[in-house]
Amino acid sequence: MKLKKKFLEKSKKIAEERIDVLMNLAEKESKAGKIDRSKNYVLLGKKIAMRMRMPYPKEWKRRICKNCGSFLIYGKNARVRTKAKNYPHVVITCLECNSITRIPIKSEKK
């Protein structure tokens, strides 16, 4: 059992590194204007995470459109706004498919 656990930990670490490399490549290609290639890198990263049954890293998860799968670069193909109507939140709008993602802002406790 110990051997299997060590193998799983090692393979998950390798998967995290690969996802990180793929997302960095997706960001680079997105900035260069090659959107199809960046979508491909995002899809590969998601497949690796699903195969290893691990959650997608939060810092990358928020940079991907849930509807069309494109890598979001704020100001280029995504719009970011803060709203405080009912509850304070950040609204990220994908400018390719017009889907909206809302992320709540937690208020500081005094």
UniProtKB/Swiss-Prot annotation:
One GO molecular function term? Answer: zinc ion binding
**Catalytic activity, per the record?**
Endonucleolytic cleavage of RNA, removing 5'-extranucleotides from tRNA precursor
Q: Name one GO biological process term.
A: tRNA 5'-leader removal
Identify which top EC class this enzyme belongs to: hydrolase
Provide the alphabetized UniProt keywords: Cytoplasm, Endonuclease, Hydrolase, Metal-binding, Nuclease, tRNA processing, Zinc
Q: Does the keyword Hydrolase apply?
A: yes
The record lists Zn(2+) as bound by 65, 68, 94, 97
Instruction: State its cofactor.
Output: Zn(2+)
Main location as per UniProt: cytoplasm
Q: Which Gene3D superfamilies match?
A: 6.20.50.20, Immunoglobulin FC, subunit C (1.20.5.420)
Cite the cofactor comment.
Answer: Binds 1 zinc ion per subunit.
What family does the database annotate?
A: Belongs to the eukaryotic/archaeal RNase P protein component 4 family.
Function in brief: Part of ribonuclease P, a protein complex that generates mature tRNA molecules by cleaving their 5'-ends.
- Assembly and oligomerization: Consists of a catalytic RNA component and at least 4-5 protein subunits.
Q: Which PANTHER family match?
A: RIBONUCLEASE P PROTEIN SUBUNIT P21, RIBONUCLEASE P SUBUNIT P21
Q: What is this protein called?
A: Ribonuclease P protein component 4
What species does this protein belong to?
A: Methanococcus maripaludis (strain C5 / ATCC BAA-1333)
**Encoding gene, per UniProt annotation:** rnp4
